[in-house]
Amino acid sequence: MEEINIRKIPTDGIAYLRKLEGSDLFYGIDHCGDDLYEAKELFEMDHRLDRNRLIFVTYPEGIVYEPLTAEKGEYFGDPVFDEGLIFILKADFNNRKLIIYRSDLKFKEIMVHVQLDMEEDEDCYNLRLVRYPVTLIKTSKDNLFRILWPLKTEFEIDPHESFDHRIDEYLIFSMWFEDPDYREEAIIRRYPDGEKLWNHKGSIFTTDDGQEWLVG
């Protein structure tokens, strides 16, 4: 058998990487991954998985960076890349804080971008960072879509509707139907009040160079 050229990337146990969209980086999160809802449950159970790790891997060099280290009771969510910077979400359940860090691509300058207090009933369900620009959102189990930062607002969405991404003052959602055949519909809502402005068969796909394609 021909020798296969396989390059080893030492990640200290993190075995799955995802593309950091818009950049040449990949990232990986261990244990509960990016699910901060599950992370909160682990914290409340005093589980042995009392924190997680977030790494970045450069391409094509394959250099591994671990720019931030979580303490007990702290968990990272999915990072996003926007305007040449990396944004990292961390939930600090000990102090009931949500912290967003920002970093350059070389991880030479990392600082707190914003720090928010967790609400009393915060369950971190579907809590995540999105772009463009960087926005902290969550969708509750009762189909209430909420923006937590930079501007707080909330509105109801359809049970089959899910948030995809933001384009400046527009919020892009997708909704699926089975009537009886499966199909999808793209929906554009206005930021921040959520008024539905447009809907069309298909879905909106963002290319690497920032083009928006209606596919379907």
What are these regions (language model features)?
Residues 1-17, 36-70, 93-122, 133-163, ...:
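Surface-exposed loop/turn elements that mediate protein-protein interactions on large endomembrane-trafficking
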Residues 24-37, 87, 134-137, 172:
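Structural core positions within WD40/WD-like beta-propeller blades
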Residues 61-87:
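Blade-loop segments of beta-propeller domains
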Residues 18-20, 80, 128, 164-165:
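Conserved beta-strand position repeated across blades of beta-propeller domains
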Residues 22-25, 83-84, 131-134, 168-170, ...:
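Short coil/turn segments that connect the beta-strands within blades of beta-propeller domains
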Residues 13-27:
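Short, low-complexity, intrinsically disordered N-terminal segments
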